[in-house]
Curated annotation (Swiss-Prot):
Protein name: Profilin
Lineage summary: Viruses, Varidnaviria, Bamfordvirae, Nucleocytoviricota, Pokkesviricetes
Similarity comment text for this entry: Belongs to the profilin family.
Organism: Ectromelia virus (strain Moscow)
Chief location bin: host cell
GO molecular function, one term: actin binding
Entry's Gene Ontology cellular component terms: host cell; host cell cytoplasm
Length: 134
């Protein structure tokens, strides 16, 4: 599975529509499994992951020591399994977190990338991973 996580990160880093991405375990250690180095999502800590998956009413979560604003939250819903956010700082960028059976996929678009495109890309990655049982 590790190779698959790194492939997702590699795909995202080659695409100039996205600014940041990470894959984070939410079942056991709640640690970063793969990320674009030296970016915000590479700094995600376990406490931030716990807050995202346990607090359904979270409005302004910290992720990688920065604040974000929740737009929609269906992260723990088995049919949707996504959360949409915006950066809580300028320039405003769209973010989507999608949940697989074992990990969270974080994807941040550039300020010029549409929310819909970030959503579709992130959810597609999660759907493909879910199909493998992970």
């Amino acid at each position: 599975m590790a190779a698959e996580w790194h492939k997702i990160i590699e795909d995202v880093s080659k695409n100039n529509k996205f600014e940041d991405a990470a894959i984070v375990d939410y079942k056991t250690k709640k640690n970063v499994l793969a990320a674009i180095p030296n970016r915000t999502f590479a700094k995600i800590i376990p406490g931030e992951v716990i807050a995202l998956i346990t607090n359904r009413n979270i409005l302004k979560p910290r992720i990688g020591q920065k604040f974000f604003i929740v737009y929609t939250n269906s992260l723990m819903d088995e049919n949707t399994y996504t959360m949409e956010l915006l950066t809580g700082y300028a320039p405003v960028s769209p973010i989507v977190i999608a949940r697989t059976h074992t990990a969270l996929i974080f994807l941040m678009g550039k300020p010029t990338t549409s929310r819909r495109e970030v959503y579709r890309t992130c959810r597609d990655y999660a759907t493909n991973v879910r199909a493998t049982g992970n």
